From Swiss-Prot:
Protein name as annotated: Destrin
N-acetylalanine modification, residue list: A2
GO BP, sorted A to Z: actin filament fragmentation; actin filament severing
Annotated disulfide bonds: none
InterPro entries cross-referenced by the UniProt entry: ADF-H (IPR002108), ADF-H/Gelsolin-like_dom_sf (IPR029006), ADF/Cofilin (IPR017904)
Keywords, comma-separated and alphabetical: Acetylation, Actin-binding
Motif (Nuclear localization signal): 30-34
UniProt key word Electron transport: no
UniProt source species: Gallus gallus
Residues covered by the ADF-H domain: 4-153
Top-level taxon in the UniProt lineage: Eukaryota
Biological role: Actin-depolymerizing protein. Severs actin filaments (F-actin) and binds to actin monomers (G-actin). Acts in a pH-independent manner.
Length: 165
């Protein structure tokens, strides 16, 4: 079911910048986004970047000790959101970084909000071509490291964001 909600150009630009890794100077790498949260505009017609709801690679280890925990804490308790998270994880063979797309729809969110976010998900997913991992979370229990490791590769994943799973 389509909702007719549009996706802002800035959302598409952020996705492209997170997906495409260019050769960058250390300063440019620090400005790369680790996580970004998206919301509906006040008129509910467009998916936009939620102001102030991002983690930069340069923040990790400086102002943010655990990027995934910080990301989860940025999500509202009583409303829905979309998010992109640049997951760093290790398998038994190698270290990897892959983008994850999240639909956050907590139980306490208003029914109308859950409906519009669910029906608008396809619009944003069409813009996010090449996402390997998608996760719908309905509460904090869906966002623990073990659940995320399962989405990233199950028993092959041995560490997520530097912590064993």
């Amino acid at each position: 079911m389509a909702s007719g909600v549009q996706v802002a150009d800035e959302v598409c630009r952020i996705f492209y910048d997170m997906k495409v890794r260019k050769c960058s100077t250390p300063e440019e790498v620090k400005k790369r986004k680790k996580a970004v949260i998206f919301c509906l505009s006040p008129d509910k017609k467009c998916i936009i970047v939620e102001e102030g709801k991002e983690i930069l690679v340069g923040d990790v280890g400086v102002t943010v000790t655990d990027p995934f925990k910080h990301f989860v804490e940025m999500l509202p308790e009583k409303d829905c959101r979309y998010a992109l998270y640049d997951a760093s994880f290790e398998t038994k063979e190698s270290k990897k970084e892959e983008l994850m797309f999240f639909l956050w729809a907590p139980e306490q969110a208003p029914l109308k909000s859950k409906m519009i976010y669910a029906s608008s998900k396809d619009a944003i997913k069409k813009k996010f071509q090449g996402i390997k991992h998608e996760c719908q979370a309905n509460g904090p229990e869906d966002l623990n490291r073990a659940c995320i490791a399962e989405k990233l590769g199950g028993s092959l994943v041995v560490a997520f964001e530097g912590s064993p799973v």
